[in-house]
């Protein structure tokens, strides 16, 4: 069942039919394809290319196809080349020869281009809503757990921070992701419908009308670019990759924190699994799967970049390969965002363990150096003094605050009784710009 064949002597082989067909994956574009066709038919009637009665018959037929698909009466299956063929052939079967006028002034090249832009735009707004849900979960988790913990560099305990500071770093990441997606929408918000195969059409059509009907801000500037542009999908895949990278980093920390080596958090049973052989195991599989699926989205980005790198203008069948990877990335990002929101909303903090971890690792060493600077010593000299104290403490299994004043004075006579209050862990967060964290 094809929309072409007049110039061919021999039938297409079954092997080629199967190899060429995209129906099994581009069927998810059925709504966009029907919506685009309805806008196209309205425009053809407005421009006097179709009669008013023909317009109504075709639109009614398209709506009936949409309703039957939505209600499960019509299954998207069979020996069709793609979703466009499926809908047009079913339309002709329903309304007769008038349905053959649907494709007047249009190519599948601009048809699939507008379908993909509509889908990409719609799904991006949907993903933004998933990000908004995650941002709310992060904010609630941070605000409801006022606890201090170690901050890390090089995965080594570094300085005292609040849990809120740590979690709001991820808020900043995902908020950037949202801004990036909004920028992607701004760039892609142009209609390619009316570009034809590559050089427009001899019909006096109204591209601006269909652009408005379909909710685009304008028409594309160049016909050839309009049908062959997949930059917006690559840009979205790049944005999706960054979202997954941020989810993966957060997942990695949840995996570490839930281990007995850290024991900072407890991931709920709802987002954990067990072992078939080790009865004691409770594995952070939700976080591990998010971390693992990140490479899958990266692969979709690299796949489309590689597909597009050597294609001459204008449309080439290579571009059919834009869909499976993009659709898979969309599904992966949506599921990963949803799972992360669920995992964080049920996360339990082990606050005592977090606080106790602060007491190990000399997390107040920087504050001790600042103390000496406030007493008049140059910071580099203070850095050296505190480094020597830390070495002594390590060798003697003590903390800086455990040393008596007399011992501290053997390293520097600027130390006084107020050093203990100055380097107390919670007090260190109440000075200077740190008060804002």
UniProtKB/Swiss-Prot annotation:
InterPro entries: Arg_succ_lyase_C (IPR029419), Argininosuccinate_lyase (IPR009049), Fumarase/histidase_N (IPR024083), Fumarate_lyase_CS (IPR020557), Fumarate_lyase_fam (IPR000362), Fumarate_lyase_N (IPR022761), L-Aspartase-like (IPR008948)
Subcellular location field: Cytoplasm
EC numbers: 4.3.2.1
Domain of life: Bacteria
Entry's Gene Ontology BP terms: arginine biosynthetic process via ornithine; L-arginine biosynthetic process
Reaction(s) this enzyme catalyzes, per UniProt: 2-(N(omega)-L-arginino)succinate = fumarate + L-arginine
Signal peptide range in chain numbering: none
Main location: cytoplasm
Gene Ontology cellular component list: cytosol
Class in the EC hierarchy, top level: lyase
Keywords from the named record: Amino-acid biosynthesis, Arginine biosynthesis, Cytoplasm, Lyase
NCBIfam families: argH
Protein name in UniProt: Argininosuccinate lyase
Source organism per UniProt: Clostridium novyi (strain NT)
Lineage: Bacteria, Bacillati, Bacillota, Clostridia, Eubacteriales
């Amino acid at each position: 069942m094809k929309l072409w064949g007049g110039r061919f002597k021999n039938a297409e082989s079954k092997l080629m039919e199967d190899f060429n067909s995209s129906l099994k994956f581009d069927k998810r574009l059925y709504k966009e394809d029907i919506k685009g066709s309805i806008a196209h038919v309205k425009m053809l009637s407005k421009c006097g290319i179709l009669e008013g009665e023909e317009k109504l018959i075709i639109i009614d037929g398209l709506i009936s196809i949409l309703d039957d698909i939505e209600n499960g009466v019509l299954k998207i299956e069979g020996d069709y080349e793609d979703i466009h063929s499926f809908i047009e052939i079913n339309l002709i079967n329903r309304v007769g020869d008038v349905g053959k006028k649907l494709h007047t002034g249009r190519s599948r090249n601009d048809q699939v281009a507008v379908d993909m832009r509509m889908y990409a735009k719609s799904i991006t707004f949907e993903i933004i809503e998933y990000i908004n849900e995650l941002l709310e979960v992060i904010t609630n988790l941070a605000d409801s757990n006022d606890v201090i913990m170690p901050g890390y560099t090089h995965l080594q305990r570094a300085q005292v921070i609040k849990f809120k500071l740590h979690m709001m770093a991820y808020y900043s990441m995902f908020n950037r992701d949202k801004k990036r997606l909004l920028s992607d929408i701004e760039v892609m918000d142009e209609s390619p419908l009316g570009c034809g195969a590559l050089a427009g059409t001899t019909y006096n059509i109204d591209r601006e009308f269909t652009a408005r009907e379909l909710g685009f801000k304008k028409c594309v500037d160049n016909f050839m670019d309009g049908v062959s542009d997949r930059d917006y999908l690559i840009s979205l895949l790049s944005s999706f990759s960054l979202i997954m990278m941020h989810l993966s980093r957060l997942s990695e920390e949840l995996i570490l924190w839930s281990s007995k080596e850290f024991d900072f958090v407890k991931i709920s049973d709802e987002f954990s699994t067990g072992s078939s052989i080790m009865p004691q195991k409770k594995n952070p599989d939700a976080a591990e799967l998010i971390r693992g699926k990140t490479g899958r989205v990266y692969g979709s980005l690299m796949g489309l970049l590689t597909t597009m790198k050597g294609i001459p203008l204008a449309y080439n069948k290579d571009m059919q390969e834009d869909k499976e990877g993009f659709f898979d990335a969309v599904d992966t990002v949506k599921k990963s965002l949803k799972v992360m929101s669920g995992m964080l909303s049920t996360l339990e903090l082990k606050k005592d363990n977090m606080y106790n971890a602060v007491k190990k690792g000399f997390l107040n060493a920087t504050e001790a150096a600042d103390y000496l600077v406030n007493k008049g010593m140059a910071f580099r000299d203070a850095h050296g003094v505190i480094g020597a104290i830390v070495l002594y403490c390590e060798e003697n299994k003590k903390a800086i605050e455990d040393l008596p004043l007399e011992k501290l004075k053997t390293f520097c006579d600027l130390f006084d009784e107020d050093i203990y209050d100055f380097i107390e862990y919670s007090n260190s967060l109440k000075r200077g710009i740190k008060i804002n964290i």
